[in-house]
Curated annotation (Swiss-Prot):
Active site: 36, 77
Protein name as it appears in the record: Signal peptidase IB
Entry keyword annotation includes Hydrolase: yes
Cytoplasmic side: 1-7
Gene Ontology BP annotations: signal peptide processing
Record keywords, A-Z: Cell membrane, Hydrolase, Membrane, Protease, Transmembrane, Transmembrane helix
GO molecular function annotations of the record: serine-type endopeptidase activity
Primary localization: membrane
Amino acid sequence: MKKELLEWIISIAVAFVILFIVGKFIVTPYTIKGESMDPTLKDGERVAVNIIGYKTGGLEKGNVVVFHANKNDDYVKRVIGVPGDKVEYKNDTLYVNGKKQDEPYLNYNLKHKQGDYITGTFQVKDLPNANPKSNVIPKGKYLVLGDNREVSKDSRAFGLIDEDQIVGKVSFRFWPFSEFKHNFNPENTKN
């Protein structure tokens, strides 16, 4: 009986250590604050952020990431442009390297927009702190925008983000449980 109890205690302790390691070094929880990603992610929802996988697999256009906006705040936004991309918007239409891109995650907000446009017209060189002579995203930089463009504070306001600002890629939403979702890339977005 004592041996069986000891085995249970050791098993539970090992499980907690594994959970701690996973939570500390692989996946961390994050609570969505604000409406900048609405309706994809809503205020108060909880997501799991993969803090290692994106470093080995890289970030792709369409990934949703959490990053350090400043010393006190982390933001969650969608990657629109990666290093080497030439990005521009013309009247709410995204062009990457000269090719028109679909943004299905904007469908809801386009239908319910308050003004003429939700994204507007801009090029990489128009962003704060960007090279005014180049529309190409430099190495180690990313262009990020919120899905709710009319309220989002994103690269249009603070410029491109540095790779070292990125905390990780959103892997899945786990709260509320009824809204569980594991992939936020454009081909898996329904709005």
